[in-house]
UniProtKB/Swiss-Prot annotation:
It catalyses: ATP + H2O + 4 H(+)(in) = ADP + phosphate + 5 H(+)(out). HAMAP family: ATP_synth_beta_bact (MF_01347). This is ATP synthase subunit beta, chloroplastic. It is found in: Plastid, Chloroplast thylakoid membrane. Produces ATP from ADP in the presence of a proton gradient across the membrane. The catalytic sites are hosted primarily by the beta subunits. One of its GO terms (molecular function) is ATP hydrolysis activity. The modification Phosphoserine is found at residue 13. NCBIfam families: atpD. GO terms for cellular component: chloroplast thylakoid membrane; proton-transporting ATP synthase complex. Belongs to the ATPase alpha/beta chains family. Keywords: ATP synthesis, ATP-binding, CF(1), Chloroplast, Hydrogen ion transport, Ion transport, Membrane, Nucleotide-binding, Phosphoprotein, Plastid, Thylakoid, Translocase, Transport. It comes from Brassica napus (Rape). The keyword 4Fe-4S does not apply. F-type ATPases have 2 components, CF(1) - the catalytic core - and CF(0) - the membrane proton channel. CF(1) has five subunits: alpha(3), beta(3), gamma(1), delta(1), epsilon(1). CF(0) has four main subunits: a(1), b(1), b'(1) and c(9-12).
Length: 498
């Protein structure tokens, strides 16, 4: 006789509604689960193991089906530690892929790969969830317009502009200002575009993730007193997590970003740090599943895995996801399959320079090494393109002359070269900019500089309009008018000292 599920015990109704299997084998984070004939779960379905270990501690492990082995067995990868599991334990097939909370309630919170909040602020106030596995948007829904994504950061907008709905690689070592640049981008997209950001820490160091969270609270990007005012949702899969969690945490972050784009129709900024660790986790899982390794020991499905993530990051007619991905290059070998596969998807690269950071020029974006496919006259217009090329030529000439200056001094240069060096030094300083998120540390107010203002400023420097002004006037200012005002102040100060 069938018991009415509305009156029956909830545990019984769960068993009725879901297929129940048993653990047949455990090898590290990989579980083989036997199901009754005809009750096999689909690939990517979530499986949940609940019970108690030998010490009586509660166990709640979520896994994801990766392979159907035959003989009514499936192979699944655990999203958390498998300590305490044993053969014969009950496994519930949830009937769907992993689903995570989405929407405005996720802002200001830190989540793990399963979408569970981990920053002790109580449960997430949303009933809306979304599966982490989805198809990329259909061709008919894509917005193929090539448009610039204005960041308000002069060096980025002028020399290596970001594409709306594009993918940007962020290359930078420790201590060159990567975190501050990320936070400023999060702040600016919220103010200028009414957009939000999602940060996916893939294989992050726990300390780095904690530092980022603390700095975001300090700079106002996260407002714990009023979470609705926060501008970012954080999703972390740390280095100590099993490979399954590190492989899927990028998809969790992307799913949250997709909801803001498709349902809220917003422009979204998605940060992935580090995209290499996503590949690395996939490689570990591939080996655990017994697949034959490909070149340099990577998984044979490397391109497909990367493509399934990257193709979902795009502009649609409703909104856009612009992604900034930190890229680690193993042993500085750009031909390594992991970075080589990543490069195929990037529209722009932002390279941070330790030399510029040492000079105190922030953001320390290298103007000559950073590139963008958007810097073409037909996309950005003739004036922008010509200005950017002249700025690069001036800086390149200054770089070539630096050895001569170091050995012989400025006096040995021709009049033309001396002028080039003077303008290049002004340009170098004018590429610096005070950030909103650094106000609490520097005391100087942040500046958002529109693209038209940026182009006007650099054109005036290149034309020789400001050859008479001191180079200090161009350091850490917003637009060119602030530089002229600063020059006047410097002149008055020097007169008063005399």
């Amino acid at each position: 006789m069938r018991i009415n599920p509305t009156t029956s015990d909830p545990a019984v109704s769960i068993r009725e509604k879901n297929n129940l299997g048993r653990i047949a084998q455990i090898i590290g984070p990989v579980l083989d689960v036997a199901f009754p004939p005809g009750k096999m779960p689909n690939i990517y379905n979530a499986l949940v193991v609940k019970g108690r270990d030998t010490l009586g501690q509660e166990i709640n492990v979520t896994c994801e089906v990766q392979q159907l082995l035959g003989n009514n067995r499936v192979r699944a990868v655990a999203m958390s530690a498998t300590e305490g599991l044993k053969r014969g334990m009950d496994v519930v097939d949830m009937g769907n892929p992993l689903s995570v909370p989405v929407g405005g309630a996720t802002l200001g919170r830190i989540f793990n790969v399963l979408g569970e909040p981990v920053n002790n602020l109580g449960p997430v106030d949303t009933l809306t969830t979304s599966p982490i596995h989805k198809s990329a948007p259909a061709f008919i829904d894509l917005d193929t317009t090539l448009s610039i994504f204005e960041t308000g950061i002069k060096v980025v907008d002028l020399l290596a502009p970001y594409r709306r709905g594009g993918k940007i690689g962020l290359f930078g070592g420790a201590g060159v200002g990567k975190t501050v640049l990320i936070m400023e981008l999060i702040n600016n997209i919220a103010k200028a575009h009414g957009g939000v950001s999602v940060f996916g820490g893939v294989g992050e160091r726990t300390r780095e993730g904690n530092d980022l969270y603390m700095e975001m609270k300090e700079s106002g990007v996260i407002n714990e007193l009023n979470l609705a005012d926060s501008k970012v949702a954080l999703v972390y899969g740390q280095m100590n997590e099993p490979p399954g969690a590190r492989m899927r945490v990028g998809l969790t972050a992307l799913t949250m970003a997709e909801y803001f784009r498709d349902v809220n129709e917003q422009d979204v900024l998605l940060f992935i740090d580090n995209i290499f660790r996503f590949v690395q986790a996939g490689s570990e899982v591939s080996a655990l599943l017994g697949r034959m390794p490909s070149a340099v020991g990577y998984q044979p499905t490397l391109s497909a895995e990367m493509g399934s993530l990257q193709e979902r990051i795009t502009s649609t007619k409703k909104g856009s996801i612009t992604s900034i991905q930190a890229v680690y290059v193993p042993a500085d070998d750009l031909t390594d399959p992991a970075p080589a596969t990543t490069f195929a998807h990037l529209d722009a690269t932002t390279v941070l320079s330790r030399g510029l950071a040492a000079k105190g020029i922030y953001p320390a974006v290298d103007p000559l090494d950073s590139t963008s496919t958007m810097l073409q006259p037909r996309i950005v217009g003739e004036e922008h393109y010509e200005t950017a090329q002249q700025v690069k030529q001036t800086l390149q000439r200054y770089k070539e002359l630096q050895d001569i200056i170091a050995i012989l001094g400025l006096d040995e240069l021709s009049e033309e070269d001396r002028l080039t060096v003077a303008r290049a030094r002004k340009i170098e300083r004018f590429l610096s900019q005070p950030f909103f998120v650094a106000e609490v540390f520097t005391g100087s107010p942040g500046k958002y500089v529109g693209l038209a203002e940026t182009i006007r400023g650099f054109n005036l420097i290149l034309s020789g309009e400001f050859d008479s002004l001191p180079e200090q006037a161009f350091y850490l200012v917003g637009n060119i008018d602030e530089a002229t005002a600063k020059a006047t102040n410097l002149e008055m100060e020097s007169k008063l000292k005399k």
